[in-house]
Curated annotation (Swiss-Prot):
Alphabetical list of SMART domains matching this protein: Aamy
EC assignment: 2.4.1.18
Keyword Chaperone annotated: no
NCBIfam families: branching_enzym, PRK05402.1, PRK12313.1
Gene3D superfamilies (UniProt xref): Glycosidases, Golgi alpha-mannosidase II, Immunoglobulins
Listed name of the protein: 1,4-alpha-glucan branching enzyme GlgB
Catalytic site: D431, E484
Top-level lineage group: Bacteria
Biological processes per GO annotation: glycogen biosynthetic process
Gene: glgB
Physiological role: Catalyzes the formation of the alpha-1,6-glucosidic linkages in glycogen by scission of a 1,4-alpha-linked oligosaccharide from growing alpha-1,4-glucan chains and the subsequent attachment of the oligosaccharide to the alpha-1,6 position.
Protein source organism: Parasynechococcus marenigrum (strain WH8102)
Family classification: Belongs to the glycosyl hydrolase 13 family. GlgB subfamily.
Length: 775
């Protein structure tokens, strides 16, 4: 190639760099072989002079072809072992040359697995990584944007000018650039120029930390600095079957549990202050608690209540508080509202130290249209479908992932592995599964597209969920994967190997709606709706169900749980206690939303906090004590949880006394053969001498009574227990003559020791009677 041609080529490359239109800067920058040896070219926009520093020598670089492309010739290849001294705007500094580092970061196998959708640790390649190259510290940036014309790094390091740090395009639509000297905490974004010339500034899809809203830049964060202390917890978790354990979950939203005063400083773990994060404009003077403050206050509270797990509404980064976290933009980062990723790790570590598992809400069903997020990422519908009939939730104003694209599926599946591996979470609850499974979800006729078979099922979403759950349990066998699925889609909790979706628990939405419909009725009318409280048993063994009274039931005009109840205040409290006790004794794992544990009155408000002052009133304190005791009873009695998903674990005694709105049943445990008798009266009318058949004669201790004075009840009961009579009822030869308090639930346990004493006393009495007869 002639000199004029080379000159013309260099001028064109310089202009492409200056206009952010170059996709292969390594083709001309860095050390390049030349006729005279090696030509080193550096790209320094708006620099006045550049000097090469190498091997103790200095060489002033010239710009013969473009004013910002500086070069000099050496007799040898300097590799990456050189620096440049740059004078720009009267300021001089020295730096390593980003384009001296030519080796690819993403290897062939990485690209292959990613293109297949099977790279379970793709986050170890994608994103911004603090690393060393050739012994030099810096940050390696890696991005997937296959349709972009060019991609640049923006940040404080270049005054947010995309001309300074163009990235190199590799195979498979991958873009890379190593920036030496860049440190942890640096802000950055990607500037993506599309094929039609538009320019977008995007946060890193794989960013490990982001700014506090309303700012939305990504933050360079370290992944490997935290020292965990939960090894024994993790070992126990992964070697046990969670379905055979008691699971009682406290669902909560970190930002509205309780607030601190904005006057109270936010102290970081190193003791330095940090600017507080305001709770909301509508609550001036309040700030959000930090992860550290939540660990100090929330964890002891949850432990005292006796819950086994905390479920966090989405803590992935999101721009809008009002979305409750369900419109995610930062999939690989805990929200910075409450602190740093390591501070969230410390929160989880503390939970495990106190015996509490951590479940997070995971939202793979949709994402928002925010300009800095995934939408139209590289100038094409990269993460979403282009056709709005399958790519948009119009009612929610969000976009739907394109599950048929391998790299998109990989982004989500690896994200699941990331949260379990990096943050030691114990489970996920997958939000809005029904919206993923059906193409016509919330869509009128004509606004949805049938699948390849002409049906409404989203086969790509089904395959994605199966893959996600398969990979999850492959890596973390003791994990929880909970589906919020509101339809009758079959085999949600069956293994993927036999065609199931692969979850191990499913929220029982039918139970929830039936219970709330029933308890909202005036008690007199409940006799006509007995089916509401008994129907769930007919299908409870078709899936592994979790009973949930969730956040969705205490917003948007639905009232909080206490205020759903009919009657005067006394009846509202009693109904609430009875419902919670029925939930804890019914087959299935348990979840309640924050505030229900003490009878919150007001609807949940994401910008407020809970009505903690209500605990100054005895009835509310009574509900809290009831929940404490329910959790204690639940964990102490394997009959209430061991056989949740085996029909042996439940047996009706009587479900047909609709006239009195009374039900009775047994919870049984197969390995020990123990059982509990549960009797519930769902009217304000108490009953004396109410007969309940039992399978074995003897003494039955009353171990729980929702009407106890301790809980704010009328303190009716059975004096601690009752012996059986030889009175046949409900198919049993023996029965209990019980007092049923109003709006109550009672639990009885057969006491072998006292039964033996009672039997002995009965035998003596019988012998005395026979002696008296002979006289």
């Amino acid at each position: 190639m002639g000199g004029a041609a080379v000159l013309d080529w260099m001028v064109q490359d310089g202009e492409r760099l200056a206009n952010c239109r170059h996709d292969h800067p390594l083709a001309i920058l860095g050390p390049q072989p030349s006729d005279a040896g090696w030509t080193v070219r550096v790209w320094m926009p708006e620099a006045h002079s550049v000097t090469l520093l190498e091997g103790g020598r200095e060489a002033l670089m010239t710009a013969p072809n473009h004013p910002w492309v500086f070069e000099t010739t050496l007799s040898h290849d300097p590799g990456s072992n050189y620096k440049v001294r740059v004078e720009r705007g009267g300021i001089t500094h020295e730096q390593h040359d980003p384009w001296a580092f030519r080796d690819e970061w993403m290897g062939d196998m990485d690209r292959h697995l990613f293109a297949q959708g099977n790279h379970h640790h793709i986050w170890q390649r994608m994103g911004a990584h603090l690393t060393q190259r050739d012994g030099i510290s810096g940050v390696m940036f890696c991005l997937w944007a296959p349709h972009a014309l060019s991609v640049s790094i923006l940040g404080d390091l270049n005054s947010w000018d995309g001309r300074h740090h163009p990235m190199q395009q590799r195979l498979g639509g991958i873009w890379e650039l190593f920036i030496p000297g860049l440190a942890e905490g640096s802000l950055y974004k990607y500037e993506i120029r599309t094929q039609d010339g538009h320019c977008y500034q995007k946060a890193d899809p794989y960013g490990f930390q982001h700014e506090v809203r309303p700012d939305n830049s990504s933050v360079v964060a370290r992944l490997d600095g935290f020292q965990w202390s939960d090894g024994s917890w993790m070992q126990r978790r992964d070697s046990s079957n969670p379905l055979e354990q008691p699971i009682s979950v406290y669902e909560m939203h970190l930002g509205s549990w309780i607030h601190a005063s904005a006057e109270e400083p936010w102290i970081q773990p190193d003791g330095s202050p940090r600017a507080p994060v305001p709770a909301a404009d509508m609550k001036p003077g309040a700030r959000l608690l930090t992860y550290a403050e939540l660990a100090a206050r929330l964890i002891p509270y949850v432990k005292e209540r006796g819950f086994t797990h905390i479920e966090l509404m989405p803590i992935t980064e999101h721009p809008f508080d009002g979305s409750w976290g369900y419109q995610v933009t930062g999939w690989y980062a805990p929200t910075s509202r409450y602190g740093t990723p390591d501070e969230f790790r410390a929160f989880v570590d503390r939970c495990h130290a106190e015996g509490i598992g951590v479940i997070i809400d995971w939202v793979p069903g949709h994402f928002p249209k925010d300009a800095h997020g995934l939408a139209f990422f590289d100038g094409t519908h990269l993460y979403e479908h282009g056709d709005p009939r399958i790519g948009e939730h119009k009612e929610w104003g969000t976009l739907i992932f394109n599950y048929s694209r391998n790299e998109v599926r990989n982004f989500l599946v690896a994200n699941l592995v990331f949260w379990f591996e990096q943050f030691h979470i114990d489970g996920i609850r997958v939000d809005a599964v029904a919206s993923m499974l059906y193409r016509d979800y919330l869509r009128p006729d004509g606004e949805w597209l049938a699948n390849e078979h002409g049906g409404r099922e989203n086969t790509e979403a089904v395959q994605f969920l199966q893959q996600a759950n398969h990979v999850l349990f492959q890596h973390f066998p003791g994990a929880l994967s909970i589906a919020e699925e509101s339809t009758t889609w079959p085999m949600v909790t069956q293994p993927t190997e036999i065609g199931g979706l692969g979850f191990n628990l499913k929220w029982n939405m039918g139970w929830m709606h039936d219970m709330l419909d029933y308890f909202e009725l005036d008690p007199w009318f409940r006799q006509f709706h007995q089916n509401n409280i008994t129907f769930s048993i007919w299908y409870t063994y078709t899936e592994n169900f979790m009973l949930a009274l969730s956040h969705d039931e205490v917003v948007h005009g639905k009232s909080h749980l206490l205020h759903k109840m009919p009657g005067d205040d006394w009846q509202k409290y009693a109904n609430t206690r009875a419902l919670l006790a029925y939930m804890w004794t019914h087959p299935g794992k348990k979840t309640i939303f924050m505030g229900m544990e003490f009878g919150q009155r007001a609807e949940w408000n994401v910008w407020g906090d809970l009505q903690w002052d209500l605990l100054n009133y005895e009835p509310h304190k009574g509900i809290q004590l009831l929940v404490d005791d329910l959790n204690t009873l639940y964990k102490a009695e394997p009959a209430l949880w061991r056989d949740d998903f085996d029909q042996f674990g439940f047996q009706w005694i009587d479900c047909n006394d609709n006239r009195h709105s009374v039900i009775s049943f047994m919870r049984r445990e197969s390995s020990s053969g123990t059982w509990l008798v549960v009797v519930a009266n769902f009217t304000p009318q108490s009953h004396s001498h109410y007969r309940v058949g039992v399978p074995l004669a003897g003494f039955y201790e009353e171990i729980f009574n929702t009407d106890a004075a301790r809980y704010g009840g009328s303190n009716l009961g059975n004096m601690g227990g009752k012996p059986t009579d030889e009175w046949s009822i409900h198919g049993y030869e023996n029965s209990l003559d019980l007092c049923l308090p109003p709006l109550s639930l009672l639990v009885f346990r057969h006491d072998p020791k006292r039964s033996l004493q009672a039997a002995s006393a009965s035998a003596c009495d019988k012998a005395d009677d026979e002696t008296a007869d002979t006289n």
